[in-house]
Amino acid sequence: MTATAPVKTEYEAVIGLETHVQLGTATKIFSNASTEFGADPNTHIDPVVLGLPGTLPVLNQKVLEYAVKAGLALNCQIAPYSKFDRKQYFYPDLPKNYQISQYDLPIAEHGWIEIEVAEKGKEPYTKKIGVTRLHMEEDAGKLVHAGSDRLAGSTHSLVDYNRAGVALAEIVSEPDLRTGKEAAEYAQELRRIMRYLGVSDGNMAEGSLRCDVNISIRPKGTEKFGTKVEIKYMNSFNAIQRAIEFEIERQIRCLETGEPIVQETRLWDEGKQVTKSMRSKEGSSDYRYFPEPDLGPIEVSETQRETWRSELPELPAQKRHRYAEQYGLSAYDARVLTDEKSTADYYEATVAAGADAKQAANWLMGDIAAYVNANKLLVSDLPLQPQDLAELVNLIEAGTISGKIAKEILPELLEKGGSPKAIVEAKGLTQISDPAQIEALVDELLAAHPTELEQFRAGKTKLQGFFVGQLMKKTGGRVDPKLSNQILNQKLKG
């Protein structure tokens, strides 16, 4: 009797993200100390930040506004009553030895966002990801380890309290994510929403947006969760995806070899592209939460909530859907144009100024995007105004200039701005579209190249490209390409 081969178990990952978003207020959450990034160490501190005896925290009302607006944008229920709590732990970057956070009564709960996932070789799909909660808290300081980028290997450590007390919104997702790609898309969509709202710049390099990943593995088709592992220190969306993909493989390998998966916190080593064990994972009981005695309860009235709701901008997902319907753009084009609010605003202003929607999109996603990215700018920083881009698009559409001429004058427009029409007229770049004028130019060209003309008529048809190139050279690229090709074809065939 032939033995059947064992069926290989298929596994799936269960992933949730905890995202810390620095709220872009001018002062800290409980004090008047500045939140400016990049200042000299320990210059943006005060007695409240340091927790000196006799000081009392006072909630920055702008933080509450930003947190509620973020919660509304994430389709959360806003709590009419919430409170702050003390989260107790000892670490050098925490000057009070406790962090003021929110525990059992967060400001926002039970939300969701929709992500669009496009993986190479697979059909794109949308997925709704639950948002468990959003709560307010204060950031910790920052440790600098001399001689190493980590504590291990350093000779000594320094602490900078400038970041301590900066307002954070911690956004916790449901464990609805299944792949590294989904997690990266979720984090990017969160960043887009926060930037559209204007509540955060979402700058990962400066720590304005930081993600911790919780991940476990289980056999497909089962409901029970596996042992959860937390991953920290991913400083880009690509790093989030790669860290998760590595950790999925590591945990599957553990299950298949019988090695136990330990509940722990691991760090992502960008250089080696691996996760490394950092410490055992704490539970909430380890923090000994209790209500913050120095702050009163937080109350948000229905009137205040609805006032803030009315101030929300059109969000990225809404814009994407509208661009597809109103402008007839592809899902890809709509996604690119709405990635940054400044680009979306610029695009809409260009179309409103009379430009064809698709042509305006092509210019913004092509040559203009290349210039903006190379110079680390936003589209809104450009001297080229939306109405001037619309004028450029319309000059091409009307046949006044060719696309080639438009590309030639674009660098000047991007660097100095101005009217494309005025530049074209001043430089004599208007397109030659008169059939009689083009015919005369073609006659001159053929008369100047009798040998090539004879070879073409003898069957060497590839020489047509030669004649096209010579005509463009003769006219400086100003001749109407479609009309000139028609006339050239007629003349070449005799």
UniProtKB/Swiss-Prot annotation:
It comes from the Bacteria. The keyword Protein biosynthesis applies. This is Aspartyl/glutamyl-tRNA(Asn/Gln) amidotransferase subunit B. SUPFAM superfamilies: GatB/YqeY motif, Glutamine synthetase/guanido kinase. It catalyses: L-glutamyl-tRNA(Gln) + L-glutamine + ATP + H2O = L-glutaminyl-tRNA(Gln) + L-glutamate + ADP + phosphate + H(+); L-aspartyl-tRNA(Asn) + L-glutamine + ATP + H2O = L-asparaginyl-tRNA(Asn) + L-glutamate + ADP + phosphate + 2 H(+). PROSITE patterns: GATB. Keywords: ATP-binding, Ligase, Nucleotide-binding, Protein biosynthesis. The lineage of its organism: Bacteria, Bacillati, Cyanobacteriota, Cyanophyceae, Synechococcales. Belongs to the GatB/GatE family. GatB subfamily. One of its GO terms (molecular function) is glutaminyl-tRNA synthase (glutamine-hydrolyzing) activity. Its EC number is 6.3.5.-. Heterotrimer of A, B and C subunits. PANTHER family: GLUTAMYL-TRNA GLN AMIDOTRANSFERASE SUBUNIT B MITOCHONDRIAL AND PROKARYOTIC PET112-RELATED, GLUTAMYL-TRNA(GLN) AMIDOTRANSFERASE SUBUNIT B, MITOCHONDRIAL. Allows the formation of correctly charged Asn-tRNA(Asn) or Gln-tRNA(Gln) through the transamidation of misacylated Asp-tRNA(Asn) or Glu-tRNA(Gln) in organisms which lack either or both of asparaginyl-tRNA or glutaminyl-tRNA synthetases. The reaction takes place in the presence of glutamine and ATP through an activated phospho-Asp-tRNA(Asn) or phospho-Glu-tRNA(Gln). GO terms for biological process: glutaminyl-tRNAGln biosynthesis via transamidation; translation. NCBIfam families: gatB, PRK05477.1-2, PRK05477.1-4. InterPro entries: Asn/Gln-tRNA_amidoTrfase_suB/E, Asn/Gln-tRNA_Trfase_suB/E_cat, Asn/Gln_amidotransferase, Asn/Gln_tRNA_amidoTrase-B-like, GatB, GatB_C_1, GatB_Yqey_C_2, Gln-tRNA_amidoTrfase_suB_CS.
